[in-house]
Amino acid sequence: AEGLKGSLSLLLALVVLLPLIALHRRVNWAPLTQPVLLLLPIIGFTLVIYVIRDEPLLAHYGWLIFPAAWAAWYGALRYLEKQPGYPLGALHVASALLLTVSIGWQLSQPLSAGIWAISAWGLTFALALVAIQRLKHLGWPFQRHAATMNTLLPRILVGLLALWMVISNLQAPGSSGAIPYLPLLNPLDLTNLAAIWLIFRWLHRHDPTLITDRQLAYGLPGALAFLWINAALLRAFHFTLDIPFRFEPMLASFAVQSGLSILWSVIGLVTMLLATRRGWRPLWLVGGALMAVVVLKLFTVDMSGTGTIARIIAFLTVGGLLLVVGYFAPVPPRAPEDPEDSDRSTIADNSEALHDKH
């Protein structure tokens, strides 16, 4: 009943507000267009009602009313382009975000609670970001409001996508539905992979000015990838060995701790090999720090109760990887000092020496 009331309220708003634009065409009185701005918050309020009722937007004639409301709203925005004094750029960003959330809610509703519903939200944010990349050359509204539609809106979507990655990988995955869970080949892991690629691509190709620091621009996608691969391993243990997806059971599991040690060692090895090949000393130090954490973990956690085969395998594997690192991945040399900085430091040293003599 509440969902039906929300749909009817939205329909009533359309019936009341849209004639104001038609009337404004005749009398050209500016205040007539101002109430039309209420249509967007009414759409948002109706969405909240559906969310509270846990109902899809297509219910209660929503399949007809919501498309009509969005068409009317964007038609009103197009008409308001001719009227001065309206924050149209901000309105377009708010509209796009609300439309994205509406689509995400609708996509997640038919799916049972679990990795499919969680993946639907990530897929929605990812597709919205891709759509902006493809549509940014359109005259309206993207080129007309380029500062907000082509810069601010994608940045918000990148942030939402990163936030979705954190939430989806920290919470319990729920059920995998009727389809058996396949590690790395399930919708949640595949959506995470797509999200990492999109965030990396956006930071380095489409919006390189968002993060000017090179290490941070590589570090953010790298941190998200590290979070995802660890969560993917824990989900694999959760579904295959029936280990509860909680901190205490995972910490107490011999298989989980050995798997994490091997995974971190492989990541550290790959990171250090890549850093040696590219000459990236900071990246090598990150890999070295991860290997040090693995060694510390082996002696404080993994080997605390000796005798299990999983722990012995983990210890031997990590030891072998450390040997590979020592041979194939030596630490890269420091970056050469900037000649101008060297000259300035030399001049400063000479001036200090002359000052000491006097």
Question: Residue ranges of each PLM-predicted region?
Answer:
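Alpha-helical transmembrane segments of multi-pass membrane proteins
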Residues: 1-358
